[in-house]
Protein backbone atom coordinates (compact mmCIF):
# COMPACT_ATOMS: atom_id res chain seq x y z
CA UNK A 1 0.00 0.00 0.00
CA UNK A 2 1.67 3.19 -1.22
CA UNK A 3 -1.30 5.55 -1.01
CA UNK A 4 -1.13 8.52 1.34
CA UNK A 5 -4.88 9.02 1.39
CA UNK A 6 -5.96 9.07 5.02
CA UNK A 7 -8.73 10.09 7.38
CA UNK A 8 -7.33 13.54 8.22
CA UNK A 9 -6.18 12.43 11.69
CA UNK A 10 -2.53 12.09 12.71
CA UNK A 11 -2.44 9.62 15.59
CA UNK A 12 -4.24 6.59 16.98
CA UNK A 13 -3.44 6.60 20.71
CA UNK A 14 -4.64 4.38 23.55
CA UNK A 15 -6.74 1.28 24.03
CA UNK A 16 -5.54 -2.30 23.70
CA UNK A 17 -3.45 -3.97 21.02
CA UNK A 18 -6.43 -5.75 19.44
CA UNK A 19 -7.70 -2.66 17.62
CA UNK A 20 -4.18 -1.64 16.57
CA UNK A 21 -3.53 -5.05 15.04
CA UNK A 22 -6.80 -4.79 13.12
CA UNK A 23 -5.96 -1.29 11.86
CA UNK A 24 -2.48 -2.45 10.83
CA UNK A 25 -3.94 -5.38 8.90
CA UNK A 26 -6.36 -3.01 7.18
CA UNK A 27 -3.46 -0.73 6.21
CA UNK A 28 -4.81 2.29 8.07
CA UNK A 29 -1.76 2.76 10.32
CA UNK A 30 1.81 2.86 9.02
CA UNK A 31 5.42 2.68 10.17
CA UNK A 32 6.20 5.85 12.13
CA UNK A 33 9.94 5.32 11.75
CA UNK A 34 10.59 5.28 15.49
CA UNK A 35 12.30 1.86 15.32
CA UNK A 36 14.90 3.36 12.99
CA UNK A 37 15.22 6.70 14.80
CA UNK A 38 15.70 5.12 18.23
CA UNK A 39 16.83 1.48 17.87
CA UNK A 40 18.35 1.68 21.37
CA UNK A 41 14.85 1.76 22.89
CA UNK A 42 13.73 -1.55 21.42
CA UNK A 43 15.58 -4.21 23.37
CA UNK A 44 14.77 -6.50 26.29
CA UNK A 45 16.43 -3.99 28.63
CA UNK A 46 14.21 -1.08 27.57
CA UNK A 47 11.02 -2.05 25.68
CA UNK A 48 10.96 -5.81 25.00
CA UNK A 49 9.16 -6.97 21.89
CA UNK A 50 7.30 -9.58 23.95
CA UNK A 51 6.91 -10.05 27.68
CA UNK A 52 4.90 -12.67 29.60
CA UNK A 53 3.16 -13.74 26.40
CA UNK A 54 2.09 -10.22 25.39
CA UNK A 55 3.38 -8.31 22.37
CA UNK A 56 4.68 -4.83 23.26
CA UNK A 57 5.43 -3.43 19.79
CA UNK A 58 4.89 -4.29 16.14
CA UNK A 59 8.00 -5.55 14.36
CA UNK A 60 7.10 -3.41 11.34
CA UNK A 61 6.86 -0.28 13.51
CA UNK A 62 3.18 0.30 12.85
CA UNK A 63 2.28 0.48 16.54
CA UNK A 64 4.33 0.81 19.72
CA UNK A 65 3.21 0.24 23.32
CA UNK A 66 3.53 3.38 25.46
CA UNK A 67 2.17 2.39 28.84
CA UNK A 68 1.10 -0.79 30.64
CA UNK A 69 -2.38 -1.91 31.65
CA UNK A 70 -3.26 -4.70 34.04
CA UNK A 71 -6.33 -5.80 36.00
CA UNK A 72 -7.17 -6.01 39.64
CA UNK A 73 -9.47 -5.00 42.47
CA UNK A 74 -10.39 -1.57 43.76
CA UNK A 75 -11.50 -1.71 47.39
CA UNK A 76 -12.90 0.44 50.18
CA UNK A 77 -10.98 -0.03 53.43
CA UNK A 78 -13.82 1.36 55.55
CA UNK A 79 -16.33 -1.05 54.01
CA UNK A 80 -13.98 -4.01 54.47
CA UNK A 81 -13.55 -3.20 58.16
CA UNK A 82 -17.32 -2.92 58.55
CA UNK A 83 -17.75 -6.37 56.99
CA UNK A 84 -15.05 -7.97 59.12
CA UNK A 85 -12.88 -8.78 56.12
CA UNK A 86 -9.31 -9.45 57.29
CA UNK A 87 -6.89 -6.91 55.85
CA UNK A 88 -7.15 -6.12 52.17
CA UNK A 89 -7.91 -8.33 49.14
CA UNK A 90 -4.80 -9.66 47.40
CA UNK A 91 -6.04 -12.66 45.32
CA UNK A 92 -8.86 -13.20 42.87
CA UNK A 93 -10.19 -15.83 45.29
CA UNK A 94 -10.97 -13.04 47.75
CA UNK A 95 -13.90 -12.04 45.52
CA UNK A 96 -15.61 -15.28 46.62
CA UNK A 97 -15.31 -14.61 50.37
CA UNK A 98 -18.78 -15.00 51.98
CA UNK A 99 -18.22 -11.77 53.94
CA UNK A 100 -18.42 -9.91 50.63
CA UNK A 101 -21.89 -11.19 49.74
CA UNK A 102 -23.74 -8.35 48.02
CA UNK A 103 -20.65 -6.14 48.15
CA UNK A 104 -18.80 -6.98 44.91
CA UNK A 105 -19.12 -4.70 41.87
CA UNK A 106 -18.74 -6.42 38.49
CA UNK A 107 -19.29 -5.49 34.85
CA UNK A 108 -20.87 -7.45 32.03
CA UNK A 109 -18.04 -9.03 29.99
CA UNK A 110 -20.22 -9.03 26.87
CA UNK A 111 -20.38 -5.21 27.11
CA UNK A 112 -16.86 -4.45 28.39
CA UNK A 113 -13.80 -5.83 26.63
CA UNK A 114 -11.50 -4.81 29.48
CA UNK A 115 -13.54 -6.73 32.03
CA UNK A 116 -13.73 -9.73 29.71
CA UNK A 117 -9.93 -9.61 29.59
CA UNK A 118 -9.82 -9.54 33.40
CA UNK A 119 -12.02 -12.66 33.55
CA UNK A 120 -9.75 -14.29 30.98
CA UNK A 121 -6.76 -13.55 33.25
CA UNK A 122 -8.57 -15.28 36.13
CA UNK A 123 -9.09 -18.39 34.01
CA UNK A 124 -5.55 -18.35 32.65
CA UNK A 125 -4.14 -18.21 36.18
CA UNK A 126 -6.11 -21.32 37.13
CA UNK A 127 -4.85 -23.11 34.01
CA UNK A 128 -1.25 -22.16 34.77
CA UNK A 129 -1.57 -23.30 38.38
CA UNK A 130 -3.04 -26.62 37.32
CA UNK A 131 -0.25 -27.15 34.80
CA UNK A 132 2.38 -26.62 37.49
CA UNK A 133 0.61 -29.08 39.78
CA UNK A 134 0.50 -31.71 37.04
CA UNK A 135 4.17 -31.16 36.23
CA UNK A 136 4.89 -32.11 39.84
CA UNK A 137 2.32 -34.88 40.32
CA UNK A 138 2.14 -36.56 36.90
CA UNK A 139 5.69 -36.51 35.61
CA UNK A 140 5.11 -39.60 33.47
CA UNK A 141 2.27 -38.01 31.52
CA UNK A 142 3.35 -36.69 28.10
CA UNK A 143 3.75 -32.90 28.07
CA UNK A 144 0.97 -32.37 25.53
CA UNK A 145 -1.47 -34.43 27.61
CA UNK A 146 -0.50 -32.56 30.79
CA UNK A 147 -1.13 -29.25 29.09
CA UNK A 148 -4.46 -30.39 27.68
CA UNK A 149 -5.57 -31.66 31.10
CA UNK A 150 -4.46 -28.41 32.77
CA UNK A 151 -6.36 -26.29 30.27
CA UNK A 152 -9.59 -28.29 30.58
CA UNK A 153 -9.50 -28.44 34.39
CA UNK A 154 -8.24 -24.88 34.79
CA UNK A 155 -11.08 -23.62 32.60
CA UNK A 156 -13.64 -25.10 34.98
CA UNK A 157 -11.76 -23.90 38.07
CA UNK A 158 -11.67 -20.37 36.67
CA UNK A 159 -15.37 -20.39 35.79
CA UNK A 160 -16.23 -21.67 39.27
CA UNK A 161 -14.27 -18.82 40.83
CA UNK A 162 -16.05 -16.30 38.60
CA UNK A 163 -19.40 -17.93 39.42
CA UNK A 164 -18.92 -17.41 43.17
CA UNK A 165 -17.69 -13.87 42.60
CA UNK A 166 -20.92 -13.39 40.66
CA UNK A 167 -22.86 -14.86 43.58
CA UNK A 168 -21.30 -12.15 45.77
CA UNK A 169 -21.97 -9.41 43.20
CA UNK A 170 -24.39 -6.62 43.90
CA UNK A 171 -24.75 -6.15 40.16
CA UNK A 172 -23.22 -6.61 36.71
CA UNK A 173 -23.09 -3.16 35.13
CA UNK A 174 -22.86 -2.29 31.44
CA UNK A 175 -19.91 0.05 31.98
CA UNK A 176 -16.52 -0.79 33.48
CA UNK A 177 -16.21 2.73 34.94
CA UNK A 178 -19.05 2.25 37.44
CA UNK A 179 -17.45 -0.23 39.94
CA UNK A 180 -14.61 2.12 41.04
CA UNK A 181 -17.09 4.94 41.60
CA UNK A 182 -19.43 2.76 43.68
CA UNK A 183 -16.55 1.35 45.70
CA UNK A 184 -15.29 4.85 46.46
CA UNK A 185 -18.75 5.94 47.67
CA UNK A 186 -19.16 2.83 49.84
CA UNK A 187 -21.99 1.31 47.82
CA UNK A 188 -19.76 -1.73 47.28
CA UNK A 189 -16.67 -2.95 49.11
CA UNK A 190 -14.68 -4.40 46.20
CA UNK A 191 -14.81 -4.02 42.44
CA UNK A 192 -13.11 -5.65 39.48
CA UNK A 193 -11.48 -3.09 37.19
CA UNK A 194 -8.64 -2.16 34.89
CA UNK A 195 -5.71 -0.83 36.90
CA UNK A 196 -5.82 2.83 35.95
CA UNK A 197 -9.53 3.14 36.78
CA UNK A 198 -8.76 1.84 40.26
CA UNK A 199 -5.65 3.96 40.77
CA UNK A 200 -7.29 7.11 39.43
CA UNK A 201 -10.27 6.61 41.74
CA UNK A 202 -7.86 6.20 44.65
CA UNK A 203 -6.09 9.40 43.55
CA UNK A 204 -9.36 11.34 43.20
CA UNK A 205 -10.51 10.39 46.72
CA UNK A 206 -7.14 11.36 48.20
CA UNK A 207 -7.21 14.71 46.40
CA UNK A 208 -10.86 15.52 47.08
CA UNK A 209 -11.48 14.07 50.53
CA UNK A 210 -7.91 13.73 51.84
CA UNK A 211 -8.85 10.13 52.62
CA UNK A 212 -7.02 6.84 52.10
CA UNK A 213 -10.20 4.75 52.23
CA UNK A 214 -9.83 3.60 48.60
CA UNK A 215 -7.06 1.26 47.47
CA UNK A 216 -6.19 -0.82 44.44
CA UNK A 217 -4.29 -4.09 43.97
CA UNK A 218 -3.32 -6.26 41.01
CA UNK A 219 -3.17 -9.86 42.28
CA UNK A 220 0.36 -11.25 42.15
CA UNK A 221 0.52 -13.81 39.34
CA UNK A 222 -3.11 -13.09 38.50
CA UNK A 223 -2.84 -10.61 35.66
CA UNK A 224 -0.68 -9.91 32.65
CA UNK A 225 0.46 -6.43 31.68
CA UNK A 226 -0.62 -5.52 28.17
CA UNK A 227 0.18 -2.25 26.42
CA UNK A 228 -1.73 0.80 25.28
CA UNK A 229 -0.08 1.60 21.92
CA UNK A 230 0.39 4.66 19.76
CA UNK A 231 0.38 4.65 15.95
CA UNK A 232 0.64 6.96 12.96
CA UNK A 233 -2.33 7.05 10.60
CA UNK A 234 -1.72 6.70 6.88
CA UNK A 235 -1.67 10.14 5.24
CA UNK A 236 -1.25 11.97 8.57
CA UNK A 237 -1.56 15.70 7.71
CA UNK A 238 1.03 16.70 10.33
CA UNK A 239 3.41 13.77 10.06
CA UNK A 240 6.56 15.49 11.35
CA UNK A 241 4.83 16.75 14.49
CA UNK A 242 3.11 13.39 15.03
CA UNK A 243 6.41 11.52 14.78
CA UNK A 244 8.00 13.95 17.23
CA UNK A 245 5.13 13.33 19.65
CA UNK A 246 5.59 9.55 19.39
CA UNK A 247 9.29 10.03 20.16
CA UNK A 248 8.43 12.18 23.17
CA UNK A 249 5.89 9.74 24.61
CA UNK A 250 8.47 6.94 24.45
CA UNK A 251 11.36 9.07 25.74
CA UNK A 252 12.20 8.94 29.43
CA UNK A 253 10.81 12.48 29.81
CA UNK A 254 7.47 11.35 28.43
CA UNK A 255 7.46 8.17 30.50
CA UNK A 256 7.97 10.14 33.73
CA UNK A 257 4.65 11.91 33.19
CA UNK A 258 2.78 8.62 33.48
CA UNK A 259 3.87 7.82 37.03
CA UNK A 260 5.62 10.77 38.68
CA UNK A 261 3.71 12.58 41.40
CA UNK A 262 2.24 16.04 40.91
CA UNK A 263 4.78 18.80 41.46
CA UNK A 264 7.85 16.60 41.06
CA UNK A 265 10.28 17.83 38.41
CA UNK A 266 9.36 15.97 35.25
CA UNK A 267 5.93 15.05 36.61
CA UNK A 268 2.47 16.45 35.86
CA UNK A 269 1.43 19.92 37.04
CA UNK A 270 -2.13 19.22 38.20
CA UNK A 271 -3.19 15.55 38.22
CA UNK A 272 -1.26 12.32 38.75
CA UNK A 273 -1.93 9.94 35.85
CA UNK A 274 -1.19 6.80 37.90
CA UNK A 275 -0.16 4.74 34.84
CA UNK A 276 2.78 2.33 34.64
CA UNK A 277 5.39 3.22 31.97
CA UNK A 278 6.26 0.66 29.32
CA UNK A 279 10.01 1.27 29.56
CA UNK A 280 11.72 -1.36 31.67
CA UNK A 281 14.66 0.93 32.45
CA UNK A 282 12.26 3.38 34.13
CA UNK A 283 11.92 0.95 37.04
CA UNK A 284 15.70 0.52 37.30
CA UNK A 285 16.07 4.11 38.54
CA UNK A 286 16.16 3.50 42.30
CA UNK A 287 16.48 7.21 43.13
CA UNK A 288 13.15 7.88 41.38
CA UNK A 289 11.17 5.62 43.71
CA UNK A 290 10.35 8.46 46.11
CA UNK A 291 8.96 10.53 43.24
CA UNK A 292 6.67 7.86 41.79
CA UNK A 293 2.92 7.65 42.37
CA UNK A 294 3.13 3.86 42.64
CA UNK A 295 6.64 3.13 43.92
CA UNK A 296 5.98 -0.51 44.84
CA UNK A 297 4.75 -1.53 41.39
CA UNK A 298 7.43 -3.27 39.33
CA UNK A 299 5.61 -4.98 36.45
CA UNK A 300 8.73 -6.60 35.02
CA UNK A 301 9.65 -8.29 38.28
CA UNK A 302 7.52 -11.07 39.76
CA UNK A 303 8.31 -14.35 41.47
CA UNK A 304 5.13 -15.86 40.06
CA UNK A 305 4.29 -14.12 36.77
CA UNK A 306 1.21 -15.01 34.77
CA UNK A 307 2.35 -16.00 31.28
CA UNK A 308 -0.46 -15.35 28.84
CA UNK A 309 -0.97 -18.20 26.39
CA UNK A 310 -3.27 -17.16 23.58
CA UNK A 311 -3.65 -20.78 22.42
CA UNK A 312 -5.48 -21.61 25.65
CA UNK A 313 -8.26 -19.01 25.67
CA UNK A 314 -7.61 -16.48 22.91
CA UNK A 315 -9.86 -18.34 20.49
CA UNK A 316 -12.64 -18.55 23.08
CA UNK A 317 -12.77 -14.91 24.18
CA UNK A 318 -16.30 -14.22 22.97
CA UNK A 319 -17.46 -17.67 24.03
CA UNK A 320 -16.11 -17.08 27.55
CA UNK A 321 -18.00 -13.79 27.87
CA UNK A 322 -21.19 -15.45 26.62
CA UNK A 323 -20.81 -18.29 29.14
CA UNK A 324 -20.30 -15.87 32.03
CA UNK A 325 -23.44 -14.04 30.97
CA UNK A 326 -25.65 -17.15 30.90
CA UNK A 327 -24.03 -18.53 34.07
CA UNK A 328 -24.03 -15.38 36.21
CA UNK A 329 -25.96 -12.47 34.71
CA UNK A 330 -29.12 -14.03 33.29
CA UNK A 331 -29.87 -16.17 36.39
CA UNK A 332 -28.34 -13.68 38.86
CA UNK A 333 -31.37 -13.60 41.16
CA UNK A 334 -31.39 -17.40 41.47
CA UNK A 335 -27.60 -17.52 41.90
CA UNK A 336 -27.67 -15.00 44.74
CA UNK A 337 -30.53 -16.82 46.47
CA UNK A 338 -28.83 -20.21 46.18
CA UNK A 339 -25.53 -18.83 47.49
CA UNK A 340 -27.28 -17.31 50.51
CA UNK A 341 -28.97 -20.63 51.29
CA UNK A 342 -25.69 -22.52 50.90
CA UNK A 343 -23.89 -20.22 53.33
CA UNK A 344 -26.68 -20.71 55.88
CA UNK A 345 -26.84 -24.51 55.46
CA UNK A 346 -25.36 -27.24 57.63
CA UNK A 347 -21.90 -28.45 56.47
CA UNK A 348 -23.36 -31.61 54.91
CA UNK A 349 -26.09 -29.79 53.00
CA UNK A 350 -23.66 -27.03 52.06
CA UNK A 351 -21.29 -29.48 50.38
CA UNK A 352 -24.08 -31.23 48.48
CA UNK A 353 -25.68 -27.98 47.34
CA UNK A 354 -22.37 -26.45 46.31
CA UNK A 355 -21.59 -29.52 44.18
CA UNK A 356 -24.86 -28.99 42.30
CA UNK A 357 -24.33 -25.23 41.99
CA UNK A 358 -20.83 -25.68 40.55
CA UNK A 359 -21.59 -28.47 38.09
CA UNK A 360 -20.49 -26.66 34.94
CA UNK A 361 -20.28 -29.56 32.50
CA UNK A 362 -22.66 -27.73 30.15
CA UNK A 363 -20.04 -25.00 29.62
CA UNK A 364 -16.86 -27.09 29.87
CA UNK A 365 -13.87 -26.25 27.68
CA UNK A 366 -14.84 -28.57 24.83
CA UNK A 367 -18.44 -27.34 24.93
CA UNK A 368 -17.19 -23.74 24.71
CA UNK A 369 -15.12 -24.59 21.64
CA UNK A 370 -17.88 -26.72 20.16
CA UNK A 371 -21.56 -26.04 20.83
CA UNK A 372 -21.08 -22.46 22.04
CA UNK A 373 -18.65 -21.43 19.30
CA UNK A 374 -20.88 -22.87 16.57
CA UNK A 375 -23.90 -20.95 17.86
CA UNK A 376 -21.98 -17.68 18.14
CA UNK A 377 -20.45 -18.06 14.67
CA UNK A 378 -23.70 -19.08 13.03
CA UNK A 379 -25.06 -16.75 10.38
CA UNK A 380 -28.46 -17.35 11.89
CA UNK A 381 -28.51 -15.21 15.04
CA UNK A 382 -31.45 -17.23 16.31
CA UNK A 383 -28.97 -20.02 17.11
CA UNK A 384 -27.16 -17.79 19.62
CA UNK A 385 -30.41 -16.59 21.17
CA UNK A 386 -31.78 -20.12 21.50
CA UNK A 387 -28.56 -21.42 23.10
CA UNK A 388 -28.46 -18.50 25.52
CA UNK A 389 -32.07 -19.09 26.45
CA UNK A 390 -31.54 -22.82 26.96
CA UNK A 391 -28.38 -22.47 29.05
CA UNK A 392 -29.87 -19.65 31.09
CA UNK A 393 -32.91 -21.81 31.85
CA UNK A 394 -30.71 -24.77 32.80
CA UNK A 395 -28.62 -22.64 35.17
CA UNK A 396 -31.75 -21.19 36.80
CA UNK A 397 -33.08 -24.68 37.41
CA UNK A 398 -29.71 -25.83 38.72
CA UNK A 399 -29.47 -22.92 41.15
CA UNK A 400 -33.04 -23.46 42.35
CA UNK A 401 -32.24 -27.13 42.99
CA UNK A 402 -29.05 -26.20 44.85
CA UNK A 403 -31.07 -23.85 47.05
CA UNK A 404 -33.63 -26.55 47.84
CA UNK A 405 -30.85 -28.97 48.81
CA UNK A 406 -29.25 -26.34 51.02
CA UNK A 407 -32.58 -25.76 52.77
CA UNK A 408 -33.24 -29.48 53.18
CA UNK A 409 -36.20 -29.41 50.81
CA UNK A 410 -34.75 -31.83 48.23
CA UNK A 411 -32.62 -34.99 48.37
Tell me the role of every PLM-derived stretch.
Residues 8-173:
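Extracytoplasmic ligand-binding site segments that recognize negatively charged/polar headgroups
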Residues 9-14, 172, 189-195, 200, ...:
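Paired acidic/hydrophobic, glycine-rich loop segments that form the ligand-binding mouth/hinge
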Residues 19-22, 190-211:
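A ligand-binding cleft/hinge motif common to bilobed small-molecule-binding domains
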Residues 23, 182-184, 232:
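Hydrophobic residues within well-ordered alpha-helices
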Residues 74-79, 225-239, 257-258:
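A bilobed periplasmic-binding-protein/Venus flytrap-type ligand-binding module shared by bacterial periplasmic
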Residues 138-140, 159-165, 209-236, 281-283:
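Periplasmic-binding protein-like
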Residues 233-303:
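Mature extracytoplasmic/periplasmic domains
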Residues 335-411:
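C-terminal non-catalytic accessory extensions
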Amino acid sequence: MESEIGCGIDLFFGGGTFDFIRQAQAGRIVDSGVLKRHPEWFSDAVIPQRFAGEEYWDREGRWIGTVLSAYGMVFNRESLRRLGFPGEPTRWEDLTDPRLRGEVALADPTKSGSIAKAFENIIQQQMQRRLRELEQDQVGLPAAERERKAVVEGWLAGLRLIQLAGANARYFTDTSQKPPIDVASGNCAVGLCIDFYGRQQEEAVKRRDRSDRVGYVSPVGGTVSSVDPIALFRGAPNRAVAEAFIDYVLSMEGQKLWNFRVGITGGPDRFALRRLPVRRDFYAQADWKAWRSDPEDRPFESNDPLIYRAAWTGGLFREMAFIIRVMCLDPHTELISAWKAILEATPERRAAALAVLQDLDAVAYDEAGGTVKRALMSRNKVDEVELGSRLGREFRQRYERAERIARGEAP
